[in-house]
Regions:
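Flexible, low-complexity junctional segments that flank or bridge functional domains
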Residues: 1-184
């Protein structure tokens, strides 16, 4: 959808603009972030023993290994690894937040999807559409059966694995929400 002056998305920055404005982190800045994360998780995160046992994760070791491999990482790969380490904790209160210009930004599609039940079958329907989005037959109430070529149920489950949430239902809820609204 093209942005127009009347569109509510008109003032939203494009991802390409955001990426172009990002300053890469120096090696020292990356090391500082990793070391701060090590202190946070190893010395302050009281649920670490529980999370290790429940989810078979070792974020302290992953951070140690990341620290040793930092020189070969792009910013994108570094941030992806940090996000993965924190998501592995499956703790909604412990997150890795991207630096500026991404901090506080959300990538958003101009519609929402919600799940509902029809008998024993879960269905996914478009439940909200941004003002000005007119793409018939797409609109409110349309059933979504696939996402990026993947059956929607599987797409939601895969997306849920990329989100914090310590049980299947929490991951499903986060996976569904973040299909169309993804914090950067």
């Amino acid at each position: 959808m093209a942005k127009t002056a009347s569109s509510p998305l008109a003032s939203a920055p494009r991802l390409t603009e955001l990426l172009a404005s990002a300053e890469p982190l120096t090696l020292d800045e990356r090391r500082q972030i990793v070391r701060q994360a090590q202190v946070l998780i190893e010395q302050l995160f009281v649920h670490l023993p529980l999370k290790r046992a429940m989810h078979a994760v070792d974020p302290v070791q992953r951070l140690h290994l990341l620290d040793r491999r930092l020189e070969g990482f792009s910013d994108r790969r570094f941030h992806d690894e940090m996000i993965s380490i924190f998501i592995g904790l499956r703790d909604l209160h412990t997150n890795y937040i991207l630096p500026l210009p991404f901090a506080g930004k959300t990538a958003t599609l101009p519609f929402r999807i919600e799940a509902c039940w029809e008998g024993d079958t879960r269905r996914y329907l478009v439940s909200g559409v941004a003002e000005g989005l007119d793409l018939p037959p797409f609109g409110l109430g349309v059933e979504v059966t696939h996402w990026g070529g993947i059956p929607i149920e599987r797409a939601v489950a895969l997306n849920g694995e990329r989100n914090a949430g310590s049980n299947v239902d929490a991951r499903h809820a986060r996976g569904l929400i973040t299909l169309t609204q993804r914090p950067m």
